[in-house]
Amino acid sequence: MQAPCKSPWRTVIVSDDARDILASKITLNLNEPCAYEDVSWIKPVKYVGVWWEMIAGKSTWAYTDDLPSVKLGETDYLETKPNGRHGANNENVKRYIDFAAEHGFDQVLVEGWNEGWEDWFGKSKDYVFDFVTPYPDFDVKMLNAYAKSKGVKLMMHHETSSSVRNYERHIDKAYQFMVDNGYNAVKSGYVGDIIPRGEHHYGQWMNNHYLYAVKKAADYKICVNGHEAVRPTGLCRTFPNLIGNESARGTEYEAFGGSKPFHTCLLYTSPSPRDGLLS
């Protein structure tokens, strides 16, 4: 540890009634007050998304099966054969938008919309996504206009494949792309081993990155739902555009090995600044 240094608060919550522990806001309120003067643009939303069907194996994030590897900026997807199972296609996304509008959801998350998913995982690839180039069957402007006509917004997806430096190099361009196309919220993802090597999801370097991404997003009035991030510690009090942390074994595991019934109960009875986003 190097000086000067500030250590975080440590808390002990004691009560004769377990309900008091669950309701305690002490951890949240030990964080610094809100860092933003204007928070009128921050609004939690209910959303549905094009993602579960991929998790369940009914569709794919990738546009084609023809490419064992992708080189962004050089690979021409128009010369490939679509696999016919790409989930983030115009008609499918419009179907989700219609559902959201009918059932009172605010936004529609769309995963797999951007080029690069053919070799995104397990390749230790630095330049894996550019966060601004859609697949041929995903019309960004048309779909955002269609969503707007239905009183719904699209939610952006930034999977980084844990290539963190690549994300930081592109983050301003990615956030500006969102603003230009009507997005105001992003689900970020950090699947896989962290690049650069030697860093870990819960280490200080990555904690600094998560905070950097949230603060940078605020410059563009964008809210962040961080996935594969760290457990909530109340930083959302200081930076309230951090609207979610995926930090618990949630719904997606039901498509894998499943979760025990008691686990589902624990998620809602564990005291913390958890936001309830458990996808």
Name each model feature, range by range.
Residues 1-37:
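N-terminal accessory beta-strand-rich subdomains and adjacent acidic, glycine-rich linkers
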Residues 10-12, 49, 109, 185-187, ...:
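Structured core elements
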Residues 21-25, 57-63, 236-237:
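Short conserved micro-motifs at the rims of enzyme active sites and ligand-binding pockets
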Residues 168-270:
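Active-site neighborhood of glycoside hydrolase catalytic domains
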